[in-house]
Curated annotation (Swiss-Prot):
Residues binding Cu cation 3: H121
Name this polypeptide is given: Laccase abr2
GO terms classed as biological process: melanin biosynthetic process; pigment biosynthetic process
GO cellular component terms given for this protein: cell surface
Residues reported in the UniProt entry to bind Cu cation 4: H487
Species of origin: Aspergillus fumigatus (strain ATCC MYA-4609 / CBS 101355 / FGSC A1100 / Af293)
Length: 587
């Protein structure tokens, strides 16, 4: 079986803190998640990988055995790794690569609650299917925000139960090329390629082929303005100069079928079964997408968003939620509709391709109505009416309230842009290539190692607050930038604000005094911060250094990280953890 069924993703776990063991066996086999066969990665013989279910406070021991024909490692995305930085899963920073035939054990404590995921952190193996969900159930006495949705005690009890038994929903894009083939295509053509074949929901999807003119009508106005033709039959933007910049390109080397040449195929959709007797259902959405920004909705079912990146927020009502790469949102849904089949839709935001994936939410028991459900969004992610409410991602107040320090101890501006071609990206003018780290002694052994003297990095002291401003650079070589979902390993940080133009100030304080409208009244607390694609813009964050070790800060678009868009946070160098080589060496 090549997929993980929706029912299995809700597997039960022990109800009290314990030591919980999981084994993940990685194999390279032929699969067809969207009806087209290709080689891919399976975890324990399935795709996506099995769910890791824990209770808050549990000790997780996860044994990974690599039967793949290449090196790998596993990162537990969003897990803070407090006091276990050697378990972060980044080759060259926290461990040596797990070579073919080797095994490696990750051990960490589930200090937090919420929705996370695990995935490959070597090369472009996410694009080959190495990922699976993680859910940590909150301790029974943890304060939850459900009373802000309903003050009915029965409703609150039902919502707490729904959270514990939530439906884990992995949203991803899928390509007929392997990850390494995709990266090779960019290197040989010089193009920044972003076309996918399918959108998958829990490992199932189809290839849909529509009329290019019909798809072009769904293109958002900013992208429509730069089109000099229609979209391709796969719904992808053609390779146009405003997107690709003033670099050398080789269109004759684009692999057939990559950007155009659509051939339909189908598989059975994932089905999520809900029971109206439970009153409420919770869906834990996880974006495992490599290239796509996915907007998710459930027909005729408003959603109360109550958790973002593994942290409660004051619940927000929304009909659709946009997920950038690596983000997680948990929602509560009232089960008060007639028994029927309701579409779950995951549509690309439309910036680089018009494409969607689908699943079905069905009510258990009773006669099922055959009428089609009414959507909130269309195939191109556009709202179907003026009444549709998208989630406002700038208004996500943490629950309970939490705020950053009023002043930082350190301040950095990073200049985001291209380096040597359309497809090579950087966080600050130089390429940070993960592939170059594989042969080096991992940085966790010593922050002063000469191998990392010239690496792109930020060095901090423990118990300090750090401000980082991400400045998008616009030039002839980069006339337009896509949104960059910048994921911070280790602990979360605060999104302070965003603005247009250049960040011409020497501090956040100075910027707030000059442009108060650019800053959020309540900073958003999360582990992924997405830049605005609207020309020359900046995004400001603040985080607390409280977990010494080497951690990545990087764009979570797989192709962007692999081409150089990352840097090292050498956090807490004054109290660096003592680590021995055998702790981080696979066997």
């Amino acid at each position: 079986m090549w997929y993980q069924s929706a029912s299995l993703l809700g597997v039960a776990a022990v109800a009290q803190a314990a030591t919980v063991h999981y084994s993940l066996d990685l194999t390279w086999e032929t699969g067809s998640p969207n009806g087209v066969s290709r080689e891919m990665i399976f975890v324990n013989g399935q795709f996506p990988g099995p769910a890791i279910i824990l209770n808050e406070g549990d000790e997780a021991i996860i044994d990974v055995t690599n039967h793949l024909p290449f090196n790998t490692s596993i990162h537990f995305h969003g897990i803070e790794q407090k006091n276990t930085p050697w378990a972060d899963g980044v080759v060259g920073l926290s461990q040596w690569a797990i070579q073919p035939g080797q095994s490696y054990t990750y051990q960490w404590r589930a200090d937090t609650y919420g929705t996370y995921w695990y995935h490959a952190h070597d090369k472009a193996e996410i694009m080959d299917g190495l990922y699976g969900p993680v859910h940590i159930r909150p301790r029974p006495n943890r304060d939850s925000p459900f009373s802000m949705i309903s003050d009915d005690p029965a409703d609150i009890r039902a919502m707490k139960q729904a959270e514990r038994n939530g439906k884990l929903v992995m949203l991803s894009d899928w390509d007929h090329l392997t990850g390494q083939e995709y990266m090779k295509a960019m290197e040989e053509t010089g193009y920044d390629i972003f076309c996918s074949d399918s959108v998958l929901i829990n490992g199932r999807g189809s290839v849909f082929c529509h009329d290019p003119e019909e798809l072009t009508q769904m293109v958002p106005p900013p992208e429509l303005a730069i089109l000099n033709s229609s979209l391709t039959d796969k719904g992808c933007l053609p390779f146009v100069p405003p997107i690709q910049g003033n670099w050398e390109h080789h269109p004759d080397k684009v692999p057939p079928g990559l950007n155009e040449g659509c051939h339909p195929s189908t598989t059975q959709e994932t089905i999520f079964t809900v029971d109206a007797a439970h009153q409420w259902a919770s869906f834990h959405f996880i974006s495992a997408a490599s290239l796509k920004v996915l907007v998710v909705s459930i027909d005729e079912h408003p959603m109360y968003v109550y958790e973002v990146d593994g942290r409660y927020i004051e619940p927000q009502l929304a009909h659709s939620v946009k997920l950038y790469n690596g983000e997680r949102y948990s929602v509560m849904v009232k089960l008060d509709k007639e028994p029927a089949n309701y579409k779950m839709r995951a549509a690309n935001d439309g910036g680089n391709q018009i494409v969607s994936g689908f699943a079905t939410v069905t009510y258990e028991g009773g006669e099922t109505s055959q009428r089609p459900s009414q959507p909130y969004i269309d195939y191109g992610s556009r709202n179907t009416s003026a009444d549709v409410i998208p989630l406002d991602t700038n208004h996500l107040p943490p629950y309970p309230a939490i705020s950053p320090a009023s002043e930082p101890d350190d301040f950095h501006i990073l200049m985001l842009g291209r380096t040597n071609s359309s497809w090579e990206w950087s966080l600050d003018g130089a390429a940070f290539l993960p592939s170059n780290l594989a042969a080096l002694p991992p940085a966790i052994l010593s922050p002063q190692a000469p191998e990392f003297a010239d690496a792109l990095k930020i060095t901090t002291r423990n118990d300090t607050w750090v401000d980082i401003v991400f400045q998008l650079v616009v030039s002839e070589t980069t006339p337009i930038q896509p949104p960059h979902p910048l994921h911070k390993h280790s602990n979360k940080g605060f999104l302070l604000g965003t603005g247009h133009g250049k960040f011409n100030w020497t501090s956040i304080k100075e910027a707030k005094e000059a442009s108060p409208e650019s800053f959020l009244e309540t900073p958003v607390y999360r582990d992924t911060f997405t830049t605005s694609p609207q020309g020359e813009t900046w995004t400001a964050i603040r985080y607390h250094v409280e977990n010494p070790g080497p951690f990545l800060l990087h764009c979570h678009m797989t192709t962007h990280l692999q081409s150089g868009m990352g840097l090292i946070l050498m956090d807490g160098v004054d109290v660096w953890p003592e680590v021995y080589a055998d702790m981080i060496t696979p066997m």
